Amino acid sequence: LTNKRKDEKTISYAECHDQALVGDKTLIFRLMDKEMYTSMNKDSKNLIVDRGMALHKMIRLATIATAGDGYLNFMGNEFGHPEWIDFPREGNGWSYKYARRQWSLSEPDYLRYKYLMDFDRDMVHLFKEEDLLAFPPEPILADEAKKVLIFKRKNCIFALNFNPSASFTDYSFKAPEGEWELIFDSDDENYDGFSRLKNGERHWSDGKMNLYLPCRCAFVLKKIH
């Protein structure tokens, strides 16, 4: 994520142009595959889709939060567009069928695409509002065994638990002293999460902080005092 030269400006992205074209799969389609065609209704109960939603949000937050100088979305990955792009050509009979992006999918409340779009909008707004890309990420912890990644950027701490099944209570790590407030959470119900954390909850650090880290969840704490 941070393997870049400090003297060269770079743009980070979770998926590239080629993944969206016919012959490959978008990030979200790799995570959910055919389940996207039947289980993107918000009321549907599908563990594969739940997993895909959680990881898609986490991957995008991890990407922008470690970016060098900018973050790039590409043609619908903001809301997890389900299909590929295929421009008219001889091989498809000069068809326009897949030469599109269905932005309307991100509008209805009953489809999960809306919650991915809302997450992306608020995530990008956070980075603009706090001017976070103007400051480099500072590693705090990378726990390979538990699949936990924690780092700091400007006045914010980013905590990501990629563990598929284990949530951690009172997870302890070194952190700058002060009072910290939860300002962004991938597990928020507004982003089709399970709201295992409380919006605005506060934590204190005396040089060490203890946090509850739900599985497949990423969140941001901002120092307020």
Model-based region annotation:
Residues K174-N190:
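Solvent-exposed beta-hairpin/edge-strand motifs
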Residues C156, L197-H225:
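C-terminal beta-strand-rich structural cap/linker in extracellular carbohydrate-active enzymes
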Residues K42-G52, S104-K114, S205-N210:
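Active-site rim elements
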Residues R101-I140:
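Aromatic- and carboxylate-lined catalytic core of secreted/periplasmic carbohydrate-active enzymes
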Residues E8, E15, M53-K57, K114-R121, ...:
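A structural signal for well-ordered alpha-helical segments within the folded catalytic domains
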